Structure formats: structure tokens, C-alpha cells
From Swiss-Prot:
Coiled coil: none annotated. Belongs to the eukaryotic ribosomal protein eL32 family. HAMAP family: Ribosomal_eL32. One of its GO terms (biological process) is translation. GO terms for cellular component: cytosolic large ribosomal subunit. The keyword Signal does not apply. This is Large ribosomal subunit protein eL32. The keyword Ribosomal protein applies.
Length: 135
């Protein structure tokens, strides 16, 4: 377990050091936006990797394989649409994220059942959970 915690700490440190990858010349016109696109220009300093240019996406920025894609709490993030899907989760290694398409009535049912089973719900705040449990 200590190895897992070490890797989670390493993942956090790597995330803090990871630069914000932005599209080349994103600041020149707002129309193109900032979302990442690989630079292909023949004379592109960013593509060549000049030090005074923005960082380019590389495999070296990835986190450790064993903890890649996990929630910062260390649990696997599982999308849940109903109570049946929630019951199938393992509370020790998995946490629930309620889908955006789920309505309030079913959301309340899912939160109550998750509390019963000891499953963590990532996208419902503590105050909302208390409010739902009191209904």
C-alpha cells in the first residue's frame, strides 16, 4: 500500500509540474482558442522544441502507469446512471460519479444507496448529500 501512496504523491507532483499545453499562436487571435493542436509548420519553433517556445505534448509528461486515470483520492472513477449500476461497485477500490443526464429524484435514490453501501460519490458535495439524506 505504501508503494501506491508513493505513486499517488508522485502523480500529484508531476501534475503540478506539467505545463499548460496550449495551441501555437493562441494569443494572436481569440477565434482559434487555446485547445491543443500539434504544430506542423515548416519553420515552427514550437515543433522544433526551442527552449523559449511553449512546451509540446510528449510521453514524458505522463504519470505512473499504476495510478494513471485514478481520482486524486486513489479510487477508480465509475460513471453511474442508476442504483443497479451503483450496487455493482466495490467501495474499496471504486467511487461513483453520477451521470449528468440523471434527474433529481433518481440522484437522491443513488446518494441514499451509496451512503448505505459506503460508496463515495465524487460529484455531489457534502452539503448536498446531507440535504438528500434528510429528504
Amino acid at each position: 500500500m505504501s508503494e501506491f501512496k508513493r505513486l499517488m504523491r508522485l502523480k500529484l507532483k508531476m501534475k503540478q509540474k506539467r505545463p499548460e499545453f496550449k495551441r501555437q499562436d493562441w494569443f494572436k487571435c481569440s477565434r482559434i482558442g487555446t485547445s491543443w493542436r500539434r504544430p506542423f509548420g515548416k519553420h515552427s519553433g514550437m515543433r522544433i522544441g526551442l527552449t523559449h517556445r511553449a512546451a509540446v505534448v510528449n510521453t514524458g509528461y505522463r504519470g505512473p502507469v499504476l495510478v494513471r486515470g485514478l481520482h486524486p483520492s486513489g479510487l477508480q472513477d465509475i460513471l453511474v446512471n442508476n442504483v443497479k449500476e451503483l450496487v455493482a461497485l466495490n467501495p474499496e477500490v471504486q467511487g461513483a460519479r453520477i451521470a449528468a443526464t440523471v434527474g433529481k429524484r433518481k440522484r437522491i435514490e443513488i446518494v441514499k444507496k451509496a451512503n448505505e453501501l459506503g460508496i463515495r460519490v465524487f460529484n455531489v458535495s457534502k452539503q448536498k448529500q446531507e440535504e438528500f439524506l434528510s429528504l
